[in-house]
């Protein structure tokens, strides 16, 4: 074997070794676990943690610590979800100069056992894990092989970038530049979060009213078996452009506990009035209140459905909610609405199909005819039209509790409650909606109010049996604005007419008292 051949063979071996180490870093299966607040969080204080995650997501280890006058205090160590800032980092290194709380992440089993601060490159770790001194031979080999390894790493990194693009990893979510809380991170666990009372229970868990420092927040707690719903909701909230006044305000996400005792938390803004369902059960609404709720609800759904390129924080894809109902619309103190609960939501990105997404999801009562039939066209517009059918039913719920018309206001009922009761089966809904093509009743007295008559027409165009004939959320928003303007004009004209009639009356002259 010639000298050139030997050299090529050596470079090949080094390249393979480098490739193995680089590709191996993404195979993080276990991390060192530590929680300084273990007593309060009711978890283990230290040990190891198995990292769970989807096959197409990368897993990392992380560490957070404080440096108080040269004394290192570890706050948390454990597993960390897919984050581009952690890719291909075998060492857990903080690069900021002097943060209040140091944070680093890395790839590789137990890579967070030791952690570093890059300006000084000092190893900061528990006293039980002393730094091991590298032998001189190791340093000699390292410095001599650096040039060759750099070339090998560049080649392999280029190949990895090509594969990364080809396999179409989900886009990494960067923090939005809109004002508001930072994206979810383990540092949220440093703030005292106290659960106060259960406010609601649903398919994927329960919602608590909680106290975060001086702020009242909502905490949605998922059991570990509903991790996919928690992860999907977290990813939807973290998309660029999702900070909107009519979409529930997202604060952060956390994993509490270990192994089978793990709970998954989503922390959002808290709204005391609760859901639209709860509000309509206890209250009637005026015409102006109906318009305010309906307009802001439509505005939130329109923003969710919209594909918006060129935002400062990236491209916002169109998102279908897939579980629109009055229970998932929350009311703020001023009665403006915000859309909540994205556990079933689906995002649509250019060049990607909906794939194997199961179409028959959501709440049966609000399922569109095509969903009940299982005849869904798995394209973006089809899913958005399914949302609009359910939106029409929510508008009907609002109309049923409005005092604008002269007729009586009925007790609150869910859509189709008269026909199928409170717990319909899939077959019940198929019979009523698909075969009989029934819809909730639009009262005759509603037609006598100009605004309510236009609202009834809008509702019918939202729940049309032909999906392609349904209105968009943006169109509904514009219609509601026009409805309110029209009724204001009519009211003003009526007042002018009455005043004119009164001023044109010939009153008899007053008799003199003299």
Swiss-Prot record:
<dbReference type="GO" id="GO:0007389">
    <property type="term" value="P:pattern specification process"/>
</dbReference>
<keyword id="KW-0675">Receptor</keyword>
<keyword id="KW-1015">Disulfide bond</keyword>
<keyword id="KW-1133">Transmembrane helix</keyword>
<keyword id="KW-0812">Transmembrane</keyword>
<dbReference type="InterPro" id="IPR011009">
    <property type="entry name" value="Kinase-like_dom_sf"/>
</dbReference>
<dbReference type="GO" id="GO:0048179">
    <property type="term" value="C:activin receptor complex"/>
</dbReference>
<comment type="function">
    <text>Receptor for activin A, activin B and inhibin A. Involved in transmembrane signaling.</text>
</comment>
<dbReference type="InterPro" id="IPR045860">
    <property type="entry name" value="Snake_toxin-like_sf"/>
</dbReference>
<keyword id="KW-0472">Membrane</keyword>
<feature type="disulfide bond">
    <location>
        <begin position="106"/>
        <end position="111"/>
    </location>
</feature>
<feature type="domain" description="Protein kinase">
    <location>
        <begin position="193"/>
        <end position="486"/>
    </location>
</feature>
<feature type="binding site">
    <location>
        <position position="220"/>
    </location>
    <ligand>
        <name>ATP</name>
    </ligand>
</feature>
<feature type="disulfide bond">
    <location>
        <begin position="31"/>
        <end position="61"/>
    </location>
</feature>
<keyword id="KW-0325">Glycoprotein</keyword>
<feature type="glycosylation site" description="N-linked (GlcNAc...) asparagine">
    <location>
        <position position="46"/>
    </location>
</feature>
<keyword id="KW-0723">Serine/threonine-protein kinase</keyword>
<dbReference type="InterPro" id="IPR000719">
    <property type="entry name" value="Prot_kinase_dom"/>
</dbReference>
<dbReference type="Pfam" id="PF00069">
    <property type="entry name" value="Pkinase"/>
</dbReference>
<feature type="transmembrane region" description="Helical">
    <location>
        <begin position="137"/>
        <end position="162"/>
    </location>
</feature>
<dbReference type="Pfam" id="PF01064">
    <property type="entry name" value="Activin_recp"/>
</dbReference>
<feature type="glycosylation site" description="N-linked (GlcNAc...) asparagine">
    <location>
        <position position="67"/>
    </location>
</feature>
<dbReference type="GO" id="GO:0017002">
    <property type="term" value="F:activin receptor activity"/>
</dbReference>
<dbReference type="GO" id="GO:0005524">
    <property type="term" value="F:ATP binding"/>
</dbReference>
<feature type="active site" description="Proton acceptor">
    <location>
        <position position="323"/>
    </location>
</feature>
<keyword id="KW-0808">Transferase</keyword>
<keyword id="KW-0732">Signal</keyword>
<keyword id="KW-1003">Cell membrane</keyword>
<feature type="topological domain" description="Cytoplasmic">
    <location>
        <begin position="163"/>
        <end position="514"/>
    </location>
</feature>
<dbReference type="GO" id="GO:0071363">
    <property type="term" value="P:cellular response to growth factor stimulus"/>
</dbReference>
<dbReference type="InterPro" id="IPR008271">
    <property type="entry name" value="Ser/Thr_kinase_AS"/>
</dbReference>
<dbReference type="GO" id="GO:0032924">
    <property type="term" value="P:activin receptor signaling pathway"/>
</dbReference>
<dbReference type="InterPro" id="IPR000472">
    <property type="entry name" value="Activin_recp"/>
</dbReference>
<dbReference type="GO" id="GO:0048185">
    <property type="term" value="F:activin binding"/>
</dbReference>
<protein>
    <recommendedName>
        <fullName>Activin receptor type-2A</fullName>
        <ecNumber>2.7.11.30</ecNumber>
    </recommendedName>
</protein>
<keyword id="KW-0418">Kinase</keyword>
<dbReference type="GO" id="GO:0005886">
    <property type="term" value="C:plasma membrane"/>
</dbReference>
<feature type="disulfide bond">
    <location>
        <begin position="92"/>
        <end position="104"/>
    </location>
</feature>
<keyword id="KW-0067">ATP-binding</keyword>
<keyword id="KW-0547">Nucleotide-binding</keyword>
<comment type="similarity">
    <text>Belongs to the protein kinase superfamily. TKL Ser/Thr protein kinase family. TGFB receptor subfamily.</text>
</comment>
<feature type="disulfide bond">
    <location>
        <begin position="86"/>
        <end position="105"/>
    </location>
</feature>
């Amino acid at each position: 074997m010639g000298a050139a051949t030997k050299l090529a063979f050596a470079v090949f071996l080094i390249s393979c070794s480098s490739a193995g180490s680089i590709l191996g870093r993404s195979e993080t299966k276990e991390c060192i676990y530590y929680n300084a607040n273990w007593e309060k969080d009711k978890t283990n204080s230290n040990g190891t943690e198995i990292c769970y995650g989807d096959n197409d997501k990368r897993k990392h280890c992380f560490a957070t610590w404080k440096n108080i006058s040269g004394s290192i205090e570890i706050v948390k160590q454990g597993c960390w979800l897919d984050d581009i800032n952690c890719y291909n980092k075998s060492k857990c290194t903080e690069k900021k100069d002097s943060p209040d709380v140091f944070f680093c992440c890395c790839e590789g089993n137990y890579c967070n056992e030791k952690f570093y601060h890059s300006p000084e490159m000092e190893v900061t770790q528990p006293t039980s894990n002393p730094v091991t001194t590298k032998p001189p031979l190791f340093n000699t080999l390292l410095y001599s092989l650096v040039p060759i390894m750099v070339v090998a790493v560049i080649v392999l990194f280029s190949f990895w970038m090509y594969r990364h693009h080809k396999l179409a990893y989900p886009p990494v979510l960067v923090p939005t530049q809109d004002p508001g809380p930072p994206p979810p991170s383990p540092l949220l666990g440093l703030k005292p979060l106290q659960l106060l009372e259960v406010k609601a229970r649903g398919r994927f868990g329960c919602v608590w009213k909680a106290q975060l420092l001086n702020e009242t927040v909502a905490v949605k707690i998922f059991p570990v078996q509903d991790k996919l719903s928690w992860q999907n909701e977290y990813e939807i909230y973290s998309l660029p452009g999702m900070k909107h006044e009519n979409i529930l305000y997202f604060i952060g996400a956390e994993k509490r506990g270990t192994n089978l005792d793990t709970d998954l938390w989503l922390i959002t803004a808290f709204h005391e009035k609760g859901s639209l369902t709860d509000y309509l059960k206890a209250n009637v609404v005026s015409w102006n209140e109906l318009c305010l709720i309906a307009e802001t609800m439509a505005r939130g759904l329109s923003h969710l459905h919209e594909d918006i390129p060129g935002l400062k924080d990236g491209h916002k894809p169109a998102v279908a909610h897939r579980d629109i109902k009055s229970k998932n619309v929350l009311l703020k103190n001023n009665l403006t609405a915000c859309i909540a609960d994205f556990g079933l939501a689906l995002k649509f990105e250019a060049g990607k199909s909906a794939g194997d997404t199961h179409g028959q999801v959501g709440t049966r009562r609000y399922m569109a005819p095509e969903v009940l039939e299982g005849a869904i066209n798995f394209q973006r517009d089809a899913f958005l039209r399914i949302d609009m059918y359910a939106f029409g039913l929510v508008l009907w719920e609002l109309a049923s509790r409005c005092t604008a018309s002269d007729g009586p206001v009925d007790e609150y009922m869910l859509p189709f409650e008269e026909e199928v009761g409170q717990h319909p089966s899939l077959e019940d809904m198929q019979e009523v909606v698909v075969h009989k093509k029934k819809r909730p009743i639009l009262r005759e007295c509603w037609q006598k109010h100009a605004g309510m008559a236009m609202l009834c027409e809008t509702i019918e165009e939202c729940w049309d049996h032909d999906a392609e004939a349904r209105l968009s959320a943006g169109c509904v928003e514009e219609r509601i604005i026009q409805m309110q303007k029209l009724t204001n004009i009519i009211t003003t004209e009526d007042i002018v007419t009455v005043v004119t009639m009164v001023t044109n009356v010939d009153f008899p002259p007053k008799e003199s008292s003299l």
